[in-house]
Amino acid sequence: MTLEERVEALEKELQEMKDIEAIKELKGKYFRCLDGKMWDELETTLSPNIVTSYSNGKLVFHSPKEVTDYLKSSMPKEEISMHMGHTPEITIDSETTATGRWYLEDRLIFTDGKYKDVGINGGAFYTDKYEKIDGQWYILETGYVRIYEEHFMRDPKIHITMNMHK
């Protein structure tokens, strides 16, 4: 392999590593905005061509606005949520496309309303596709398949002492 070929291979490898890191940051922003209920900012993580498949394909949406409108209506301020994406497996498929798999662990606590004191714990596998537009990565397709989900009544003696949404 010539020096030029080695440099070219290293540049390609470096770009792939940068792309993987950018995708990790993108998914991190998605989860942060989801739990922070920052719907406008969450929308900036989504491709204009987004397709979702949440809850084993029961919830399918085809635009950033559809996604955030649904999330806004289904995640009221009375709900504390914590979505954690772990162990990413990201493959750069081309200069402008990538695929990712994430392990999701999520916890929800309802502090008011119809579901007051209900808790939900769950786990799922996310599968995403990403596209790069004008040098920026976006979520093109996202969805998860549940491993498990449990609902339970929280002990009334346990009190939430801090809630960023109140």
Curated annotation (Swiss-Prot):
Enumerate the UniProt keywords alphabetically.
Bile acid catabolism, Lipid degradation, Lipid metabolism, Lyase, Steroid metabolism
Reaction catalysed by this enzyme: 7alpha,12alpha-dihydroxy-3-oxochol-4-en-24-oyl-CoA = 12alpha-hydroxy-3-oxochola-4,6-dien-24-oyl-CoA + H2O; 7alpha-hydroxy-3-oxochol-4-en-24-oyl-CoA = 3-oxochol-4,6-dien-24-oyl-CoA + H2O; 7alpha,12alpha-dihydroxy-3-oxochol-4-en-24-oate = 12alpha-hydroxy-3-oxochola-4,6-dien-24-oate + H2O; 7alpha-hydroxy-3-oxochol-4-en-24-oate = 3-oxochola-4,6-dien-24-oate + H2O
Q: What induces it?
A: Induced by bile acids such as cholate.
Sorted alphabetically, the Gene Ontology BP terms of this entry are:
bile acid biosynthetic process; bile acid catabolic process; lipid catabolic process
GO cellular component annotations of the record: cytoplasm
Named in its record, the pathway it takes part in is: Lipid metabolism; bile acid biosynthesis
Name of one Pfam family that matches: SnoaL_4
How does the record describe its quaternary structure? Homodimer.
Protein purpose: Functions in the bile acid 7alpha-dehydroxylation pathway, which forms secondary bile acids via the 7alpha-dehydroxylation of primary bile acids, and is carried out by intestinal anaerobic bacteria. Catalyzes the dehydration step in this pathway, yielding a 3-oxo-Delta(4,6)-bile acid-CoA intermediate.
* Designated name of the protein: Bile acid 7alpha-dehydratase
Identify the gene encoding this protein: baiE
